[in-house]
């Protein structure tokens, strides 16, 4: 026996069902007791009254629920009361998402990105899909129509953007309008029954074979009339007129069936179906979280230099006269001339004296050795103070102002560690770990030892440390810093960074964070989840064709929605054998790969001068600038050609259509 086709029967609306009052056991018992306590005559009278009342109600209900035709009756919306429930239309497998929506995927303001989902409905009924962009409060801001790109897999896609792109910089006067668009957003994929397309498909066949034509055309006219009245479709008065005029033509029996059908196949109605469709049985997915960051937050070209080496020279006595923030203006101008847009400084805080390191990380410092800027803190101050050897806070603010005039951002290295002389050691001794002999433990990464650095112990007062770091970062942001490059964040609790970054970006949503974390993939991913916009990575050690192909695919794949790898050919701590052994050609090759292989790349100054001598036994530069002041001859860059190449690479990047 053939299965009965219920879909061929007239539908009745299910959108406004009468509310059903729940009956508890207690109320049922009370009603029963009340009924049994009545006398027989009273019960009989009550029964007659109840029967009459029921009959009247049933009669009224039957009149209200008169059968509706296919064109008149919308598919009902089925409310979802828990995340795992399906609606009337099924929505699955939304991308992009991060850990099934637990963490936000990251996109730039106004950046176009692809949203995909599986959207389907039972039987041969046609489905439609829309992407709804909503603000943090859940209010819809914009809709994007989705296209079915793989009917066999019910796969739908749409190019979506959140907010409007802007070329304004964080220091520009009108930047407040950009800041308001940054932060948490939601994307919801809405599936719906495409009643129009389902009807049109069948009606075209029926008109062609002359089968039940009048019913088909009448249903279409009713459908158009209902579409014109649908508030969800957000139609203009002109749009409604188009639909209603087509409905009248459909009802005009003086025309041929083909002419009547043609009225609903016009380009105007096809366009309305694309932009303002009739969406029956609307079903929303669970909201997908997105974090919108400022333009070029992941498209960046970094340039690193040490202020104490900028403008340094040999005095008449043969000793080096170090540079400072004022002489470092020359470094800003060089970075801008080469086309970079971020200047990254190492820590510029006072350097400790106790256990100060000498040249090449030697244990004993000479009388003229400046120490490592990563040995932070002295009696002159800590992380909230400018090293007097470099200048004052006013000098730093002037430095930032000049950078901004040149279109450059300032990124400041934030190394959360202390020298033995840091004010925190006395003010907060519980922030440090002590050995059994009572001394504070210095930093170690066996076999490496850092006697000039005390690591922070987060187990005693993490909340207090968080508040202090938030205060310090706020101070530097107000001075002109827009990016923090965090040193070794993977050696601190992820939750610590989650709290700090959330607090800082709540107040300053334009601020970005880069993780200098050479660590395991899980830790790198977790740091990205909690707000590190960019990350150092293992690009310097990817040299073969196979290694590069694999790494480029990884860097530019879906992982880019949470982790943005920044490619650096060298750093003060990284000088690979490839760069060491291949001279100018090697420097050129690695620069091209870095600039073209990732949206974000960086150069450590001196690259233009082919500084490629390794410290014996280490993959780092000899005479490391972390431990001494370097005097460089910048007039000699022309003979190498690397500075010109860097300039060309940045120009190619900035003028490429993919540049945001």
Please place each PLM-identified region on the residue numbering:
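Hydrophobic faces of well-ordered beta-strands that scaffold small-molecule active sites
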Residues: 301-303, 343-345, 410-412, 484, ...
């Amino acid at each position: 026996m053939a299965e009965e086709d219920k879909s061929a029967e007239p539908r009745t609306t299910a959108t406004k069902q009468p509310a059903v009052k729940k009956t508890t056991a207690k109320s049922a018992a009370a009603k029963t007791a009340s009924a049994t306590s009545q006398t027989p005559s009273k019960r009989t009278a009550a029964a007659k009254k109840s029967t009459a009342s029921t009959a009247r109600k049933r009669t009224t209900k039957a009149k209200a629920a008169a059968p509706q035709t296919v064109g008149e009756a919308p598919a009902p919306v089925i409310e979802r009361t828990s995340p795992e429930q399906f609606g009337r239309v099924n929505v699955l497998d939304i991308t992009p998402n991060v850990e099934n929506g637990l963490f936000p995927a990251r996109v730039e303001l106004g950046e176009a990105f692809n949203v995909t989902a599986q959207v389907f409905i039972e039987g041969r009924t046609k489905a439609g899909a829309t992407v709804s962009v909503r603000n943090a409060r859940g209010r819809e801001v914009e809709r994007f129509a989705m296209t079915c790109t793989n009917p066999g897999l019910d796969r739908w896609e749409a190019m979506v953007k959140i907010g409007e792109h802007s070329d304004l910089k964080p220091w520009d006067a009108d930047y407040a309008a950009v800041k308001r668009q940054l932060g948490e957003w939601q994307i919801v994929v809405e599936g719906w029954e495409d009643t129009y397309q389902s009807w049109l498909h069948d009606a075209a066949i029926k008109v062609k074979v002359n089968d039940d034509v009048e019913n088909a055309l009448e249903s279409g006219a009713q459908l158009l009339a209902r579409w014109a009245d649908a508030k969800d479709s957000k139609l203009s008065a002109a749009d409604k007129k188009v639909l209603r005029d087509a409905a009248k033509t459909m009802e005009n029996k003086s025309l041929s069936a083909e002419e009547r059908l043609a009225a609903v196949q016009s380009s105007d109605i096809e366009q309305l179906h694309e932009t303002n469709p009739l969406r029956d049985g609307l079903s929303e997915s669970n909201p997908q979280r997105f974090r919108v960051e400022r333009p070029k937050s992941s498209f960046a070209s970094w340039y690193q230099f040490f202020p104490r080496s900028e403008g340094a020279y040999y005095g008449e006595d043969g000793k080096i006269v170090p540079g400072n923030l004022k002489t470092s203006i020359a470094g800003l101008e060089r970075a801008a001339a080469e086309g970079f847009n971020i200047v990254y400084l190492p820590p510029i805080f006072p350097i400790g004296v106790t256990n100060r390191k000498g040249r090449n990380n030697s244990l004993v410092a000479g009388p003229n050795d400046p120490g490592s800027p990563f040995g932070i803190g002295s009696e002159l101050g800590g992380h909230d103070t400018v090293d007097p050897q470099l200048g004052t806070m006013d000098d730093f603010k002037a430095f930032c102002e000049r950078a901004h005039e040149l279109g450059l951002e300032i990124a400041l290295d934030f190394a959360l560690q202390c020298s033995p002389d840091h004010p925190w050691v006395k003010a907060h001794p519980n922030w440090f770990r002590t050995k059994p002999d009572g001394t504070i433990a210095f930093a170690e990464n066996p076999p490496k030892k850092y006697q000039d650095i005390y690591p922070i112990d987060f187990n005693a007062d993490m909340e207090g440390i968080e508040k202090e770091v938030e205060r310090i970062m706020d101070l530097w942001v107000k001075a002109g810093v827009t990016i923090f490059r965090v040193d070794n964040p993977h050696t601190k609790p992820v939750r610590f960074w989650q709290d700090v970054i959330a607090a800082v970006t709540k107040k300053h949503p334009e601020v970005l964070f880069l993780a200098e974390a050479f660590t395991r993939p899980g830790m790198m991913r977790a740091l990205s989840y909690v707000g590190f916009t960019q990350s150092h990575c293992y690009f310097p050690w990817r040299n073969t064709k196979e290694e590069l192909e694999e790494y480029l695919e990884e860097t530019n794949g879906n992982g880019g929605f949470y982790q943005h790898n920044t490619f650096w050919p060298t750093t003060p701590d990284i000088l690979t054998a490839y760069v060491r052994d291949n001279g100018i050609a090697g420097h050129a090759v690695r620069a091209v790969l870095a600039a073209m292989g990732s949206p974000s790349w960086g150069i450590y100054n001196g690259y233009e001068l082919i500084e490629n001598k390794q410290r014996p036994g280490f993959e780092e530069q000899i005479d490391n600038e972390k431990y001494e002041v370097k005097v460089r001859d910048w007039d000699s860059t022309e003979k190498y050609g690397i500075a010109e190449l860097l300039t060309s690479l940045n120009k190619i990047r900035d003028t490429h259509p993919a540049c945001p």
